């Protein structure tokens, strides 16, 4: 039997079509790689051609060249069934929409350049459909697809905000009041009314064209089936497009002055673009989609064309490429037009990652849970649980639910409101800095934006602490707030250290400081931070013990079992020992256990306090510099602030480290010791061993203890007494294990190792005698 029909298909964890061997796909991958590189080269050449050829004439020539080739080789009129009148109407509509999308595509190319056009427009339909599915439906495909959608959005944002594309070249290319045609004038006017720059408008235009193109391809599938195939439809559509564009091209040729000195010099560039962009890419991608999985073809194709775009973007403006191009260009444009920037490189990385994730196949083999066997002995599996577990909500629904949870709880609500206030002030400061060209305002604005990361971390931690416990995280996520506070504390220590080092260096050589905008910025920041001080002061004063913000981290008890089988072993996991099989305690403890340490809120408060001290220091140093010219005041204030920040964050780090290291809570340590003394005096209890107590979160103190009791003692009564004593001491999640002599004898019989038998024997000896030496029968 062949391998693809063997039992390994079942054991591989996936049912369905068997993939072709990688050796057979290598030729198609190499062909796809070569084709995508040629297409990227053709797009770069198209950008050069569009500088001298009108966009409508350019599209007309591309459609005409591809029509001649496809009509000659496809023979759409002689092959296949005859086309009806209704189908011809659909073909005309198809051609018209294709012309519109081509206009948007190539106009975006003139605005953004070839590299950015390839990054934005050359995405497979699978990638875009997966992206839209994640954003607007509830069946997004899991966390990986959501992560891919987030990467795609981040990539577009990087192009919009962090890609400093050429400004002077754009001004020289289309000065105000002059445009090549009514079409370009209309689009430039639209960008002006929207208030966006041409580069950013080109990015948005290409994203819009990409969505239109995917919808256009999806709607064309039924028509291609009716016509007789996608290749026949493409040939007829290009032919009709040439007919539609012909009157427009004739009018443009008669009414506008041409920039082209000799059309013969453009024959080879146009042939290159027609062959690489319009013909070869269409045919090769059609073949590869059939021979390979569409998702695999999309992943390889996206990576190859993006990598080719980065490679050509780095070398296309190099003087060596003058030998590769057929057109003459001014020398000063070789290094100014759409060059590589940090923003576009980061964007390309995120586009590659998003394409790999979104194009991955969501068809996975389900791993079922063994639930038993049939009467014939066949194993039975349950797949429904995993299927339900792997479903995830869409991004808008997830954000809506998260916002609802944030606003329900006091601490997260306070962090969210202050984060919004801080972000508003930050963006106002950045906007005013850009408007006034103030580097000081811009640097302080981005500094505050960086500080908002601490608030975001605190907000996420406050939200995660309310997540329900899972099979993997059985204690829940309450300790996330401890981790958040610890990270914020370490972050502040690093800041204080670098501020201290810089302040010491500036004491010996105080620099000149421009104080023009320092005072209003510092006063505004001080007002914002004082609001945060008032909002988070309760976190610094008494942690999580606040009547207005009760903790939602309930102390769930585990199951309490009192066994009195042949070996008389009592074993219980209980929160308070009721005399029945299973007990659960969901009540809040308002005793000493409720006074927990909310390290997350303390970390947020420490960050706000550090910013407040910074604003005060800037105000004081500004006054001293203006009034007395004391330049040394700035490093002295910074030195003082660094010491204060370090001193204020040390208690937070100390408490967080104690919780992480599972120390007995200080506020319950004395009560636990008293409770242990009372436990040792209980009737019927001989001794106890292995007492472990630790703080899990702000409202949960957990513990375990083993108690040795006499043979005639009722286990549940001992469990109830021990649990009650430790609960009063502040332990609200307790596990009690009751041990009798028969249990040790049973374990000694089962043990085969010498050390195990020795330990059990010693434990039996401690059980047989009271503290006064009386022997127990």
Swiss-Prot record:
Q: Where is the composition biased (Basic residues)?
A: 555-571, 579-589
Gene Ontology cellular component list: endoplasmic reticulum membrane; ER to Golgi transport vesicle membrane; Golgi apparatus; Golgi cis cisterna membrane; Golgi membrane; secretory granule membrane; trans-Golgi network membrane
Q: Where is this region: Disordered?
A: 547-593
What is the annotated signal peptide range for this record?
none
Give me the ranges of the annotated region His-rich loop.
538-586
Q: Which domain of life is it from?
A: Eukaryota
Q: Which UniProt keywords apply?
A: Antiport, Cytoplasmic vesicle, Golgi apparatus, Ion transport, Membrane, Metal-binding, Transmembrane, Transmembrane helix, Transport, Zinc, Zinc transport
Q: Chief localization class?
A: Golgi
Q: Describe, as the record does, how this protein assembles with itself and its partners.
A: Heterodimer with SLC30A6/ZNT6; form a functional zinc ion transmembrane transporter.
**NCBIfam families hit by this protein:** CDF
Q: What is this protein called?
A: Proton-coupled zinc antiporter SLC30A5
The organism named in the record is Xenopus tropicalis (Western clawed frog)
* Name of the gene: slc30a5
